[in-house]
Swiss-Prot record:
EC id: 2.1.3.15
Family annotation (InterPro entries): AcCoA_carboxyl_beta, Acetyl_CoA_COase_Trfase_b_su, ClpP/crotonase-like_dom_sf, COA_CT_N
Chain positions recorded as Zn(2+) binding sites: C59, C62, C78, C81
Gene name of the encoded protein: accD
GO BP term, pick one: malonyl-CoA biosynthetic process
Cofactor-binding details, from the entry: Binds 1 zinc ion per subunit.
Family of the protein in this entry: Belongs to the AccD/PCCB family.
Function, as annotated: Component of the acetyl coenzyme A carboxylase (ACC) complex. Biotin carboxylase (BC) catalyzes the carboxylation of biotin on its carrier protein (BCCP) and then the CO(2) group is transferred by the transcarboxylase to acetyl-CoA to form malonyl-CoA.
Swiss-Prot/TrEMBL keywords: ATP-binding, Cytoplasm, Fatty acid biosynthesis, Fatty acid metabolism, Lipid biosynthesis, Lipid metabolism, Metal-binding, Nucleotide-binding, Transferase, Zinc, Zinc-finger
Name of the protein in question: Acetyl-coenzyme A carboxylase carboxyl transferase subunit beta
Zinc finger map (C4-type): 59-81
Pathway field: Lipid metabolism; malonyl-CoA biosynthesis; malonyl-CoA from acetyl-CoA: step 1/1
Length: 317
């Protein structure tokens, strides 16, 4: 009986089966555990195509590619390395204000009294900047509400000729200060500039004195003025309106100074190591009051203004 059972049962041929598996698995040159799940290639291709077609931005710090939708949702902060990317002036002000009630200074237009020409005429540079930014000048001024507070706020757009300060920027800032003074509401300025606009010569340098005088009138009247230093702030803007606030906030790692780092190194003949001229360096040396992450900036500004304006029941810690 045992012999019959042995005869009728067939022992598995291990060699033949393994050969068969190997042959089946290698139809596409892969072993069985390397074969892709059916349909996954099509899914990945569709996802990659969607990413490639959606407008994206490369982080200047970690070089990650971020979709513009994700970047806007995250307030232009890189989700991978927390680097603060630039924001346009209008985006920044609309982000700050809960309700925009109006805009100031649109009637001012730049003139070219010097007929200044460098590699191209000044009017041509202005036209290019206006086309690039869809703005008429480097400073935008809005007024409205930050929660329950009426405020006037302005922001530099670094994309517009490096956020340089010319006569129109000075006119708009002075008008913002006068509006804040007349309504007795706080003024908040987001600074991002390379300095005075060389194409306007002495007219641009004169704006340093004009803006400083306007800020002094606010100080005498007891109207709060807060400056937020973003990346970068240099030159005549640093030497005037950007350093005359009642409170100075700065975004992380923002470059802030008068002359550039390389200019200083050539003058003193020394190598200046990081974090020289960074916001954190200035905080350590008492130049700025606080370095604030962009995600906490609105809450911080509101708490400070609420304290300065004596708004009750606000935690200012």
């Amino acid at each position: 009986m045992a012999n019959n059972m042995t005869d009728t049962m067939t022992k598995p041929d291990i060699n033949n089966d393994s050969t068969s598996l190997q042959q089946n698995g290698n139809k596409a040159g892969q072993s069985w555990f390397e074969r892709p799940i059916p349909g996954i290639k099509q899914q990945l291709t569709a996802q990659l195509t969607a990413v490639e077609t959606e407008p994206s931005t490369k982080c200047s710090s970690c070089h990650s590619i971020i979709t513009n939708t994700a970047l806007i949702f995250n307030c232009y902060v890189c989700p991978h390395c927390d680097h603060h990317l630039p924001m346009s002036a209008r985006e920044r002000l609309n982000w700050l204000l809960d309700q925009v009630e109006g805009e100031l200074g649109q009637e001012f237009t730049a003139k070219d009294p010097l007929k200044f020409v460098d590699s191209k005429p000044y009017p041509s540079r202005m036209a290019e900047a206006q086309e690039k930014t869809k703005e008429s000048e480097a400073l935008i001024v809005l007024y409205g509400k930050l929660r329950n507070l009426d405020i006037v706020t302005c922001a530099f757009d670094f994309r517009f000729m490096g956020g340089s300060m010319g006569s129109v920027v000075g006119d708009r800032f002075v008008q913002a200060a006068e509006k804040a003074l007349a309504d007795r509401v706080p003024l908040v300025c987001f600074a991002a500039s390379g300095g005075a606009r060389m194409q306007e010569g002495l007219l641009s340098l004169m704006q340093m004195a004009r803006t400083a005088a306007a800020i002094e009138r606010l100080r005498i009247a007891g109207v709060p003025y807060i400056v937020v230093l973003t990346n970068p702030v240099y030159g005549g803007v640093t030497a005037s309106l950007a350093m005359l606030g009642d409170i100075h906030l700065a975004e992380p790692k923002a470059m802030i100074g008068f002359a550039g780092k390389r200019v200083i190194e050539q003058t003193v003949r020394e190598t200046l190591e990081e974090p020289f001229q960074r916001a954190e360096f200035l905080l350590e040396h008492g130049v700025v009051d606080e370095v604030v992450h962009r995600h906490q900036m609105i809450d911080t500004i509101y708490r400070l203004l609420a304290k300065l304006c004596s708004v009750p029941n606000v935690d200012v810690q």
